Amino acid sequence: MTITEPYSPNNQPITFAQITDSHLFSSVDGLHHGHNVLANLKKVLLSICDNPSIKYIIFTGDLTQDHTEQSYQNFVDCVLECHITVPIYYLAGNHDEPKLLDKYFSASPFQADKEINLSHWQVQLVDSKSATPAGYVGEQALVKLKDAIQKNKNQLLMMHHHPIDVGYFIDKHGLQNKDAFWQVINSYDNIKAIACGHVHGDMTLTNAITSPINEPVVLYTCPATSIQFDPTVDGVAALSKGPGYRLFSLYADGQLNTEVVML
């Protein structure tokens, strides 16, 4: 899908919000490690709604915690209750069923497109869901990515699983075919950054193995709308932090700015 809003002459950016890992239950009162995850999602969506500079939202997966269809409906209801009108693009996380996402996200403001073309940027949503909690970008998905990349545009890739280890337990559920993935990424000099969910925390990382002719590709991870993981615990444990999301601003000259919003 092409967003037709032009860049202004004074290089004003296109800004969007990344949200991730809502981990909803069938019950609107469902708690995930002591946190009301639906209430946290609502806080995030209301914050986004209050920011008129945000032109669209990308949800990078793990909508559900209990794998019920009602949890998907609760997400949709929350979006409508918060009066979100900007397009919402989406990816499946390891907890999600892609067919259920498509079923419940079939009407506006949800958009099923996995590619957003701007005047000077291309944002691609990369499927990393596998049959296990870990991620895998299959050969077909890698070929699709290569075929879609427009060499005259700056590239930002969005995915659920992290392609760089973060140093705590979630790494055993990270991207399993990192080498094949990075072999593709490092063959392009216009991929500026990758953004992911899954790790329940915000970090800025670079791949240790990069092409000698290219600048290192930056990985931005996103805080969850549900809970933030405690990286000192070998397993799921929640920090005493609220929900969060990440903002990206894409400029016509190729500059990318990002900031994390915690609530």
UniProtKB/Swiss-Prot annotation:
GO molecular function per UniProt: 3',5'-cyclic-AMP phosphodiesterase activity; metal ion binding; nucleotide binding
InterPro entries per UniProt: Calcineurin-like_PHP_ApaH (IPR004843), CNP_phosphodiesterase-III (IPR050884), Metallo-depent_PP-like (IPR029052)
EC number(s) on file: 3.1.4.-
Binding sites annotated in the UniProt record for AMP: 23, 62, 94-95, 200
Named cofactor requirement(s): Fe(2+)
Annotated keywords: Hydrolase, Iron, Metal-binding, Nucleotide-binding
Keyword Signal: no
Domain of life: Bacteria
Name of the protein in question: Probable cyclic nucleotide phosphodiesterase CPS_4178
